[in-house]
């Protein structure tokens, strides 16, 4: 092979190898955008609520003119901007029964009329911690003279909610080991 032919062949092979490794030139391009989305739902969660144990009620001396107070707490955690409304069930209501309180605990024999009246109050109402109003707001489901409670939700941090109760003084009730009532707390949001 002549020397010029070798040079020409070498240059041709080199050119082919050089352009073979080069990216192909695009004839055009296309783009497409997309959105990343998510929805934040209103969610509220309550912790377990401990029993509201008033303790011993003495209608003869200690509680003859002063009610027996008690409270229990729970935490409420909601997404920011949720609008929770807390209500308490009204299982054993005392309305129209000429009793001292709005609610009633029984001693296991409700048919005999053995009830111990008590009240539960909306936080910050008369009788409750941090009271700011002139009349009590009885905590219930918004019916029968009761109110619900709508706490504000400034952020996702848990809030402690206090359920404050009073057993009114001087009730004429029979001796019993325990009086009780079952109350259900509900949060709607």
Predicted regions and their residues:
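Intrinsically disordered, low-complexity peptide-like regions
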Residues: 2, 19, 96, 104-105, ...
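Extracellular/luminal beta-rich ligand-recognition
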Residues: 107-138
């Amino acid at each position: 092979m002549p020397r010029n032919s070798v040079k020409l062949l070498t240059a041709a092979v080199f050119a082919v190898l050089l352009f073979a490794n080069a990216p192909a030139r695009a004839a055009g391009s296309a783009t497409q955008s997309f959105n990343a989305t998510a929805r934040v739902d209103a969610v509220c969660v309550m912790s377990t609520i401990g029993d509201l144990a008033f303790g011993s009620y003495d209608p003869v001396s200690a509680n003859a003119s002063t009610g027996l107070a008690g409270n229990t707490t729970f935490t409420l955690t909601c997404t920011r901007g949720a609008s929770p409304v807390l209500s308490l069930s009204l299982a054993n209501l005392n309305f129209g029964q000429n009793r001292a309180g709005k609610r009633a605990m029984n001693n296991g024999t409700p048919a005999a009329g053995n009830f111990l009246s008590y009240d539960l109050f909306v936080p910050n109402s008369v009788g409750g911690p941090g009271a700011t109003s002139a009349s009590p707001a009885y905590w219930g489901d918004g019916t029968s003279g009761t109110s619900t409670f709508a706490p504000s939700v400034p952020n996702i941090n848990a809030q402690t909610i206090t359920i404050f109760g009073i057993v009114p003084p001087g009730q004429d009730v029979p001796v019993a080991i325990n009086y009780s009532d079952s109350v259900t707390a509900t949060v709607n949001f």
